[in-house]
Amino acid sequence: MAKAKFERIKPHVNVGTIGHVDHGKTTLTAAISHVLAKTYGGEAKDFSQIDNAPEERERGITINTSHIEYDTPTRHYAHVDCPGHADYVKNMITGAAQMDGAILVVASTDGPMPQTREHILLSRQVGVPYIIVFMNKCDMVDDEELLELVEMEVRELLSEYDFPGDDLPVIQGSALKALEGQPEWEAKIIELANALDSYIPEPQRDIDKPFLLPIEDVFSISGRGTVVTGRVERGIVKVGDEVEIVGVRTTTKTTCTGVEMFRKLLDEGRAGENCGVLLRGTKRDDVERGQVLAKPGSINPHTTFESEVYVLSKEEGGRHTPFFKGYRPQFYFRTTDVTGTIELPEGVEMVMPGDNIKMVVTLICPIAMDEGLRFAIREGGRTVGAGVVAKIIA
């Protein structure tokens, strides 16, 4: 069987289900798959196929995730669903599945529960930009007022974490009844799909973002100057463009005088490509691995930031013992390790392997960063944690 060609006709959007255990995330995922396949065509996935999530490894961390795809008339969606709470924590922090928007599932029989809050907080910390609410199990609640109360609670909780609780879409439905093919509840799934289409804006493609290339290597070519190599993370660099060298040292400006790939000269290097960029008047010693080449003014170097961190368990090859304040590991950003110190939240004395925690990190030298940047925590080259920059402080 020939591999199906990936057709890039419609815009592609990444979403996922979040919410408390047993509130119906996987049932909703199956219901979306079925109802949209029935309505707009495509392949339907069963609950058991989704629930039986395969193990993946992302930066050495074991995560169980199910990936399904579905279409609406205007878009193609890739949807992730995780079986366990720990899988969500790891998934969101490592960025294994970056979400352009999330569907928060809340059982109307329960209302918001501890993991509801935790997933909203995580979404805020890791930069999930949009949340849509699906109130599930509404077929089991006869009281209109109770449904209104739950909706109000969910909206208030979202507002508490700086999401637009008053304005975001809330759909009241029943994933199970939709899956069983009851038309009034199937209609609610279509309503949810319409909300995804209209509420989550089309994501900006990497190629349309400002140019950034993490520097992996630096060469000096006699008679031509200095070449830096790496994979373009986003944007495009053209011959003649002004670029900045950011991070580790004082930011400097230079000009790209050539781009080459596989020993061929090109006019430009684009997102996703491995290339060498020739820099005008830059000495071999002015640049080093760990810096980035970027569009001037698009990214700044920082040393102190608040982060959300997942600490690997012993089984994942992490530490066997907790760490305390004063811990000084290496923080691996893009291509390089930088030593840093940590500050734990008030009242937290130690962090155990397998925990997730908010911490403030101060690096010994500045790194080019934006909120949402992922990093690994390492000790002697071994990964012991994964994190994401939640808020830049300095």
Swiss-Prot record:
**The name this protein goes by in its record:** Elongation factor Tu 1
Q: Which residues form the tr-type G domain?
A: 10-204
Residue ranges of region G4? 136-139
Q: Where does GTP bind?
A: 19-26, 81-85, 136-139
Known partners and oligomeric status: Monomer.
Q: Where is this region: G1?
A: 19-26
Q: Which residue ranges are recorded for the region named G3?
A: 81-84
Under which main EC class is this enzyme filed? hydrolase
What species is this protein from? Answer: Shewanella baltica (strain OS195)
Write out the annotated subcellular location.
Cytoplasm
